[in-house]
């Protein structure tokens, strides 16, 4: 029936009706899936990523499969109009999904606990232990998946608009703004804020643990903390860069730099500042060989750490360029 609007000369009305129909279909499908998700909220792992993926998939397919009809009514302007209108469903339904995820994982409460834990560390006598870093890592991977989904969807839709060649120039800024300043984008920014807090906590706790349990490794020139610390930093920085969010990368990179320049640097220096080290070596005895090995290992720690810093810097630059 939609093809009848062109002979009648009411293409714009036909476009509005057809896009309105597409919006209703997408809203209905998303609402049904969301209701199923809510019913499973008492379970340990609810798949919010799949729920958001299906919403994006429905929107993209609605545009892809109906491009001919949309352009037949109002040219490529019809496609842009449909994209902007369907983005309202992304803003509406997508925001609900992200908000429900943040509620499900109690990210606001978790972030408050982390901030309180950080404050307690500065107090005399410390305070209660913070959240379990292993649990935090699970949430970080979930948040990363949700953030990547949102960014990939946004980039795809904006690139699709820019690829159109005969669009009213005034529509392009409006379309781009619909993606970058809509309610979904704003909720995604809230999620990004929680990500930065959780990632910072995870990185600090694991680096401190690696330093605390540092031990000599048989047949190895360095102690265990060197590989452990740089593995943690590498993992956290890779995850931050994968978010494609500049503020996240800067925050995590700043945290990594602070850890290297302060706590890790202090740990490297600790062994070389051992009291009466020279006397132990000079007077000899049973402990000489052990002490000499410890000094050599401490120096190797510094040397290898310098290499790892340069390697990490190179990896960061490469991944950012990609």
Regions picked out by a protein language model, each given a short descriptive name:
Residues 1-191, 195-217:
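Extended, noncatalytic alpha-helical scaffold/tether regions
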Residues 46, 141, 145-158, 162-177, ...:
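Extended alpha-helical rod/solenoid/coiled-coil scaffold segments used as assembly/tethering elements
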């Amino acid at each position: 029936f939609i093809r009848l609007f062109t002979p009648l000369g009411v293409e714009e009305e036909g476009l509005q009706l057809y896009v309105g129909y597409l919006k209703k279909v997408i809203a209905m499908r998303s609402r049904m899936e969301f209701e199923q998700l809510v019913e499973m909220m008492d379970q340990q792992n609810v798949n919010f990523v799949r729920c958001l993926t299906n919403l994006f998939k429905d929107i993209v397919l609605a545009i892809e499969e109906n491009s001919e009809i949309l352009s037949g009514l109002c040219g490529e302007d019809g496609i842009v109009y449909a994209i902007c209108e369907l983005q309202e469903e992304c803003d509406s339904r997508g925001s609900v999904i992200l908000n429900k995820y943040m509620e499900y994982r109690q990210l606001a409460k978790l972030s408050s606990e982390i901030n309180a834990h950080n404050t307690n560390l500065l107090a005399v006598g410390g305070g209660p232990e913070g959240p379990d870093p292993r649990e935090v890592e699970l949430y970080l991977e979930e948040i990363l998946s949700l953030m990547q989904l949102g960014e990939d969807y946004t980039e795809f839709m904006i690139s699709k608009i820019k690829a159109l060649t005969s669009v009213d120039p005034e529509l392009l800024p409006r379309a781009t703004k619909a993606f970058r300043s809509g309610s979904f984008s704003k909720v995604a920014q809230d999620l990004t804020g929680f990500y930065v807090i959780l990632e910072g906590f995870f990185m600090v706790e694991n680096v401190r643990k690696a330093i605390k349990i540092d031990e000599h490794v048989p047949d190895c020139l360095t102690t265990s903390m060197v590989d452990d610390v740089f593995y943690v930093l590498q993992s956290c920085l890779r995850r931050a860069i994968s978010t494609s969010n500049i503020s996240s990368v800067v925050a995590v990179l700043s945290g990594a730099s602070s850890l290297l320049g302060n706590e890790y640097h202090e740990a490297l220096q600790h062994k070389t500042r051992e009291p009466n080290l020279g006397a132990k070596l000079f007077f000899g005895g049973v402990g000489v060989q052990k002490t000499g090995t410890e000094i050599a290992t401490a120096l190797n720690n510094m040397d290898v750490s310098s290499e790892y810093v340069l390697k990490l810097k190179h990896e960061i630059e490469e991944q950012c360029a990609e």
